[in-house]
């Protein structure tokens, strides 16, 4: 649901959400220590470009062979990304603990709170299940990207075989066949990418509260991966678009992080995550208020 119904879903003041994040960061100047490890992984991931390891000639091979080459190229970056997600969730857990108990001292050690024997297995399974669900929703988009690369490969191959390009005889059978095949692949790729994003983006925001709910559930000793994902979907009904708007407001900070090759993440990552935590707490208050108003047990 991409719109906000006033009666059912009270609107969240995003300006207040960002202000709360800035205030908390100002009150805790050593907060960057909690996000030191995930920030370092952000910098590392910026130097990982799996596309450089994929030769375009691979596209001539059968689909399963192409999938194998792509999987090998992306395996290490995906592993780094997943470790970064676990570290970031652990940092969020430490931040939530700090919000509850201001006497807690921010440190790098606190950011490893979810790596103990009791919490790590539930954290790992929950985040892995979230990744798997989002991967399933991204399949149309991934197929569209594959067809887009393949159509680009066909175009380059055709130009290589016809150095007289673009001065071609458009009436020739070979040219007509190429234009038809290229057009079909290119059109199919655009349709799949557009439809894929329409399917994927709402699901991305539906599961956006998983990490915060996981931290909350771990304290209660009730960290069931499926239940956490289901609760996140329930929480975000009526709030997906507001979260999307919040991400748009954070876009300049994402851009600043990108142009500094991730170095700015030491300062930006704590602010961005505190903003998302403030948003989560606002959604949680709204959800609890709604439950109590309807006399439903939580």
Positions of PLM-derived features:
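Hydrophobic alpha-helical membrane segments
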Residues: 2-298
């Amino acid at each position: 649901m991409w719109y906000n119904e006033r009666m059912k879903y009270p609107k969240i003041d995003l300006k207040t959400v960002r202000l709360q994040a800035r205030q908390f960061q100002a009150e805790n100047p050593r907060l960057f220590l909690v996000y030191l490890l995930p920030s370092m992984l952000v910098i590392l991931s910026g130097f990982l470009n799996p596309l450089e390891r994929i030769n375009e000639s691979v596209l001539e091979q059968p689909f399963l062979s192409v999938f194998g080459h792509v999987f090998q190229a992306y395996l290490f970056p995906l592993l780094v990304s997943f470790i970064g997600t676990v570290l970031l969730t652990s940092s969020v857990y430490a931040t939530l603990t700090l919000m509850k108990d201001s006497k807690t001292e921010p440190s790098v050690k606190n950011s490893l709170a979810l790596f103990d024997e009791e919490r790590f297995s539930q954290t790992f399974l929950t985040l892995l299940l979230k990744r798997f669900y989002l991967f399933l929703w991204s399949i149309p988009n991934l197929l569209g990207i594959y067809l887009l690369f393949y159509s680009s490969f066909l175009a380059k191959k055709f130009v290589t075989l016809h150095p007289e390009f673009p001065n071609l005889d458009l009436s020739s059978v070979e040219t007509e066949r190429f234009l038809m095949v290229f057009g079909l692949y290119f059109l199919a790729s655009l349709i799949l990418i557009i439809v894929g994003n329409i399917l994927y983006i709402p699901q991305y925001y539906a599961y956006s509260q998983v990490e915060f709910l996981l931290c909350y559930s771990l304290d209660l000793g009730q960290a069931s991966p499926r239940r956490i994902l289901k609760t996140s979907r329930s929480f975000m009904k009526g709030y997906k678009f507001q979260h999307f708007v919040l991400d748009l407001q954070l876009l300049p900070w994402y851009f600043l992080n990108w142009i500094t090759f991730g170095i700015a993440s030491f300062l930006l990552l704590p602010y961005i995550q505190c903003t998302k935590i403030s948003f989560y707490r606002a959604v949680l208050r709204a959800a609890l208020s709604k439950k109590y108003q309807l006399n439903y047990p939580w």
